[in-house]
Amino acid sequence: STIGKSIIGLEPVTSGKVLYEGQDVTNKARRRTSDYNRNVQMIFQDSLSSFNPKKRILDIVAEPLRNFDRLSPEEERRKVIELMEIIGLSEEALLKYPHQFSGGQRQRIGVARALASNPRLIIADEPVSALDLSVQAQVLNYMKRIQDEFNLSYLFISHDLGVVKHMCDELFIMYRGRFVETGKADDIYANPQHIYTKRLLSAIPVIDPVNREANKQRRIEAEKFYQENQTMYYDENGRVFDLQQLSDSHFVALNPSAKGGN
């Protein structure tokens, strides 16, 4: 979340760089350019607090249009109606206020607002973590369809690797502010190497009453291995090791002297 907010300028960067299309976007002058602000948008975790409660949905979704495009009131309204249709809401929603919608509807409106400037990258910060499972699936399906239709990229931030599996082609697993494992989806889900990745994967709920005990035992064994082998993953100060390359696409933060994982 901190990285995502730093990319769009909501959090200060104390060290390091973030490159977007070869440009350092932690440079304030670069980040303030109109093209960059148009091309990089964000969907926030808490949709209610990210909307001005005094504004109607028409004004909320139209805000990027007013910042970047010079449209007549009629063109603006028509564009907002098109965006609402994309997320499955009708024109009637335009004159309502944020509190009059469900959490899932508000999050879809957040998607529409992010989409209004026709961005190339949308940072999605835990966009479905506050929603129940059925609504999560609905919002994710809208996001996936929009991604294909508009040919845009997501920086999808989540603690739930079950959700991530549905959305992402490449994964970057972070712990204590550092990457502990990166790779293609197949690398991470079929061959996880860092214990933190394994712990996240073991936390994915599995509807499998037949193998419930076996799944529970695997989680216990992973925790036991972690407790007994922490030096494989962290130095004496608890710092994450640097990434080591396992394949063309798979990197993991292991002790360079370690021989394999669990």
Summary of predicted features, one role per range:
Residues 8:
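Helix-to-loop junction immediately C-terminal to a conserved catalytic motif
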Residues 185-261:
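Short catalytic/signature loops enriched in Gly
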Residues 164-166:
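A short, surface-exposed alpha-helical micro-motif characterized by mixed small hydrophobic
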Residues 16-24, 36:
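Conserved ABC transporter NBD signature motif
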